[in-house]
């Protein structure tokens, strides 16, 4: 069964984009996942994934953005022998693509942050975030886990740039923390996670997330109410048991007939109906109905009499 995060990514890989947005998405993919290699004396950019939908996405983005098809190599993992690995290899226009996507320049070397032309464009930022999430993002199932979405980055300045984009344009309240020789930018609020899914284009996943979140919140509310009702019932039952104990002591020591009529009437009624709440006693007592405070006053009198007899 596919994980919730896998379903989100599957939806994202089906989105059709303009060549400029394909470049923005591809810039995130290559910056975060690509390895610069040399094969047969020729430079190449290699991206490895176990997700076939993501491999197809990278293939499609390169074709859309640069007009050629990269190599797609499928291998089987040696240890598990059941999972395939997909290698997307860009073996042409490598220098041009790296320069165009501002991943490398002769003057600056490798560029680890988000390029300005993306960082200062809300539309390109949306595509870049989509690429970043597909490259190294994850999101918990809202039905079974705590709310959490994250994107892992090797470089701290890259995660800080992603945080800036998320908060500046989309008010996502993203935070950054160090993690395993890198850092993550993450979201913890359910509403903000739903907003992020909408921003990157996972509309169906966002709607499913909201449905699951609402159901979970409703279940939590019902559980709180049930727990509250249970606690109130226990409290009522405990108070009633003490009242019955007081009345039985009075009956044993001096008899209920020795009490003033109003106290005796309530005492007999409480013995007959130990399950009733204070409100129900006030409504149903034979000489009533009376107020809850009136019932409470009489019960306190009975308690004082019982304490004097102990």
Swiss-Prot record:
Signal peptide: none
DNA-binding region: 277-310
GO BP term, pick one: regulation of sporulation
Alphabetical keyword list: Cell cycle, Cell division, DNA-binding
Species this protein is from: Lactobacillus delbrueckii subsp. bulgaricus (strain ATCC BAA-365 / Lb-18)
Protein family: Belongs to the WhiA family.
UniProt-listed InterPro entries: Homing_endonucl (IPR027434), Sporu_reg_WhiA_N_dom (IPR018478), Sporulation_regulator_WhiA (IPR003802), Sporulation_regulator_WhiA_C (IPR023054), WhiA_LAGLIDADG_dom (IPR039518)
Gene expressing this chain: whiA
Protein name, as recorded: Probable cell division protein WhiA
Cystine pairs: none
């Amino acid at each position: 069964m596919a994980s919730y995060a896998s379903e989100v990514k599957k939806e994202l890989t089906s989105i059709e984009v303009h060549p400029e947005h394909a470049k923005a998405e591809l810039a995130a993919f290559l910056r975060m996942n690509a390895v610069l290699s040399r094969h047969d004396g020729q430079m190449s950019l290699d991206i490895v994934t176990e997700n076939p939908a993501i491999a197809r996405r990278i293939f499609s983005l390169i074709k859309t953005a640069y007009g050629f098809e990269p190599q797609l190599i499928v291998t089987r993992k040696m240890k598990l022998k059941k999972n395939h690995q997909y290698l997307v290899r860009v073996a042409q226009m490598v220098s041009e693509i790296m320069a165009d996507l501002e991943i490398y320049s002769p003057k600056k070397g490798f560029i680890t942050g988000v390029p300005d032309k993306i960082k200062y464009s809300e539309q390109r930022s949306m595509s870049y975030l989509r690429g970043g999430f597909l490259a190294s993002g994850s999101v918990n199932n809202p039905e079974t886990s705590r709310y959490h979405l994250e994107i892992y980055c090797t470089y701290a300045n890259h995660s800080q740039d992603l945080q800036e984009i998320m908060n500046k344009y989309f008010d996502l309240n993203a935070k950054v923390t160090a993690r395993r020789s890198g850092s993550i930018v993450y979201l913890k609020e359910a509403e903000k996670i739903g907003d992020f899914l909408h921003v990157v284009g996972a509309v169906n996943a966002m709607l499913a997330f909201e449905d699951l979140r609402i159901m979970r919140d409703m279940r939590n509310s019902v559980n709180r109410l049930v727990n509250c009702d249970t606690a109130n019932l226990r409290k009522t039952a405990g108070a009633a048991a003490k009242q019955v104990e007081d009345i039985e002591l009075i009956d044993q020591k001096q008899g209920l007939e020795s009490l003033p009529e109003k106290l005796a009437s309530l005492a007999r009624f409480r013995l007959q109906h130990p399950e009733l709440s204070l409100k129900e006693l006030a409504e149903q007592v034979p000489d009533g109905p009376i107020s809850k405070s009136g019932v409470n006053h009489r019960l306190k009198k009975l308690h004082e009499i019982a304490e004097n007899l102990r």
